[in-house]
Structure formats: structure tokens, C-alpha cells
From Swiss-Prot:
Coiled coil: none annotated. The lineage of its organism: Bacteria, Bacillati, Bacillota, Bacilli, Bacillales. It catalyses: RNA(n) + a ribonucleoside 5'-triphosphate = RNA(n+1) + diphosphate. RNAP is composed of a core of 2 alpha, a beta and a beta' subunit. The core is associated with a delta subunit, and at least one of epsilon or omega. When a sigma factor is associated with the core the holoenzyme is formed, which can initiate transcription. It comes from Listeria welshimeri serovar 6b (strain ATCC 35897 / DSM 20650 / CCUG 15529 / CIP 8149 / NCTC 11857 / SLCC 5334 / V8). This is DNA-directed RNA polymerase subunit epsilon. Keywords: DNA-directed RNA polymerase, Nucleotidyltransferase, Transcription, Transferase. Its EC number is 2.7.7.6. It is an enzyme of class 2 (transferase). The gene is rpoY.
Length: 69
């Protein structure tokens, strides 16, 4: 499954919607996504499982890439 993760680049500042970034992670569950990202230096706001149709749409963006540690 592919998950879209919305996050802020820093843990030290209050989250601001306009600064929200996103990345895509392949994992078995939302819990696994959070475990994979727990040591990263950013604040996770939301993790969303995306549908096949949503994934196809996102892949049309030339900047689309799965996160790799």
C-alpha cells in the first residue's frame, strides 16, 4: 500500500498549513509508516492511504517519488 504523509519540516515550530509538505511511503499500514519515519527530523501531521486512482493521478506529476531511507 502507498501512503501520503503530510508533514512540517521542523519539530521546533508550530505547524502552519502553508508550509505543509508531502511524501509517499510504501508500507503495510499507517503504523508501519509512522515507525519508518519516527527518527526523521520532521513533524507528521497526517497519514493517508491513497487509492489506486489517486496514485495514478499523483504519478502524473514528474516530481512523484516514493520515500526511501
Amino acid at each position: 500500500m502507498i501512503f501520503k504523509v503530510f508533514y512540517q519540516e521542523t519539530l521546533k515550530e508550530t505547524p502552519v498549513r502553508e508550509k505543509t509538505q508531502s511524501l509517499y511511503v510504501e508500507a503495510e499500514s499507517e503504523v508501519k509508516v509512522r515507525q519508518l519515519l519516527k527518527d526523521e527530523p520532521f513533524h507528521i501531521e497526517f497519514v493517508e492511504k491513497i487509492s489506486d486512482a489517486h496514485l495514478a493521478y499523483e504519478k502524473e506529476n514528474p516530481d512523484f517519488a516514493l520515500w526511501e531511507k
